[in-house]
Amino acid sequence: MATPHINAEMGDFADVVLMPGDPLRAKHIAETFLEDVREVNNVRGMLGFTGTYKGRKISVMGHGMGIPSCSIYTKELITDFGVKKIIRVGSCGAVRMDVKLRDVVIGMGACTDSKVNRMRFKDHDFAAIADFGMVRNAVDAAKALGVDARVGNIFSADLFYSPDGGEMFDVMEKYGILGVEMEAAGIYGVAAEFGAKALTICTVSDHIRTHEQTSAAERQTTFNDMIKIALESVLLGDKE
């Protein structure tokens, strides 16, 4: 039945949901890559759709910006609608010079300055990691598509406009962080808490060092390699 944030019924969502932050990107994914699409959520404009990809039922829905927003939607999808796998498909900023604009980054783990996972884990550090099988399938899908995806740690920040002055970016670069975004650590924590599986795949939308960036329109429509990797990885997962 419907929740406070999702006006769908059990069965409206597939067991796998792709989740961009932007609901308009969710609409673009559904209209571009899925067949037999129907809208399954529109509460607060957070659009959700279900359709098929090469005959496989798949859903896509926005999760908003930041860990609090994405945690609400992922929790409800898992506990109220039977979703088993979440794949975040979003954008990230690069801090390393060897990571380039539009590179695809697969988030094997997610560091964070948020305290949400410590709240879940009785004030202990929680290793927020993606499901290994989903990582492997995404890597294999990327190779099959000829995409040189990067795999490693990303950083989920609570603040988009940080007062830090850039010092933390130096630390991230030293520790090999591939990209900075705002949701993965929270999604991995929710998945662990409620027995689901999760993965984050990002496209580098801007570079913190060089100040290169993609436009909002590009972020909505041109990150197709990332979406193809996510969709093909679902099909690979079905063969396991």
From Swiss-Prot:
What are the BP-aspect GO terms? purine nucleoside catabolic process
User: Where is phosphate annotated to bind?
Assistant: 21, 25, 44, 88-91
- Recorded source organism is Enterobacter sp. (strain 638)
Q: Name one GO cellular component term.
A: cytosol
Could you tell me which Pfam families the record lists for this protein? PNP_UDP_1
> How does it associate, per the subunit comment?
Homohexamer; trimer of homodimers.
**Protease: present as a keyword of the record?**
no
Instruction: Please give the HAMAP family that the UniProt record associates with this protein.
Output: Pur_nucleosid_phosp (MF_01627)
Gene name on record?
Answer: deoD
Q: What family does this chain come from, according to its entry?
A: Belongs to the PNP/UDP phosphorylase family.
Enzyme nomenclature, EC number: 2.4.2.1
The keyword Chaperone is annotated on this UniProt entry: no
Q: Where is this site: Important for catalytic activity?
A: 219
Instruction: Give the UniProt keywords, A-Z.
Output: Glycosyltransferase, Transferase
Q: What is the protein name given in its UniProt record?
A: Purine nucleoside phosphorylase DeoD-type
UniProt function note: Catalyzes the reversible phosphorolytic breakdown of the N-glycosidic bond in the beta-(deoxy)ribonucleoside molecules, with the formation of the corresponding free purine bases and pentose-1-phosphate.
